[in-house]
Curated annotation (Swiss-Prot):
Keywords: ATP synthesis, Cell inner membrane, Cell membrane, CF(1), Hydrogen ion transport, Ion transport, Membrane, Transport. The gene is atpH. It is a peripheral membrane protein. It holds the Pfam family OSCP. F(1)F(0) ATP synthase produces ATP from ADP in the presence of a proton or sodium gradient. F-type ATPases consist of two structural domains, F(1) containing the extramembraneous catalytic core and F(0) containing the membrane proton channel, linked together by a central stalk and a peripheral stalk. During catalysis, ATP synthesis in the catalytic domain of F(1) is coupled via a rotary mechanism of the central stalk subunits to proton translocation. Disulfide bonds: none annotated. It comes from the Bacteria. This is ATP synthase subunit delta. PANTHER family: ATP SYNTHASE DELTA CHAIN. Transmembrane segments: none annotated.
Length: 179
């Protein structure tokens, strides 16, 4: 709970600045790249969150990371601020909160679409279009693959779940036949 409220404060502060400067989308993209870099490297994650490393060591690594990712000054400053306050572990939550604020600001919804096999671009676009029609908003897809679905897709937009999987259809058929 505490991590969430602290992450929200950092995200809201950076988001307010992004809105002022008209940089919501570029900063959102940069923060996603930063989050992926940190989550994709266990060694980097360890250095950034482990108190065994001095603030100076972490600061040097954060500077190299910001430079390598070509971060603009404000997102880089967020990284430095989190590092200076020993809160780099909050970075994923800050980025996720910023992303949610950006989506809301830009009138977008995120949908998690799970399919039995990877979706090609055309199928993904068709699903996004259908979900956009149903929700009356621009829908961005986060795709996942789960072979247990057997076929079809399951789409989740907020608290709504559209289940068109073969697995669910077979389960429904089995229940009907048992009656």
């Amino acid at each position: 709970m505490l991590m969430g409220s602290i992450a929200r404060r950092y995200a809201r502060a950076l988001f307010s600045l992004a809105v002022e400067q008209g940089r919501v989308e570029p900063w959102n993209d940069a923060l996603q790249v930063l989050k992926n870099a940190v989550e994709g490297s266990p060694d980097l994650r360890d250095v950034l969150s482990n108190p065994v490393y001095s603030k100076e060591q972490r600061r040097a690594i954060v500077e190299k990371l910001a430079s390598a990712l070509k971060l603009e000054r404000e997102p880089a400053n967020l990284l430095f601020l989190l590092g200076d306050r020993n809160r780099l572990a909050y970075l994923p939550a800050v980025v996720d909160t910023f992303r949610a604020l950006a989506d809301q600001h830009l009138g977008r919804l995120r949908a998690r679409v799970t399919s039995a096999v990877p979706l090609d671009a055309q199928a993904a676009q068709a699903i996004a279009d259908r979900l956009s029609q149903a929700t009356k908003a621009t829908v961005l897809l986060d795709r996942a693959v789960d072979p247990a679905l057997l076929g079809g897709v399951v789409a989740q937009v907020g608290s709504l779940v559209y289940d068109g999987s073969l697995r669910t259809q077979l389960e429904d058929l089995r229940k009907t036949l048992k009656q």
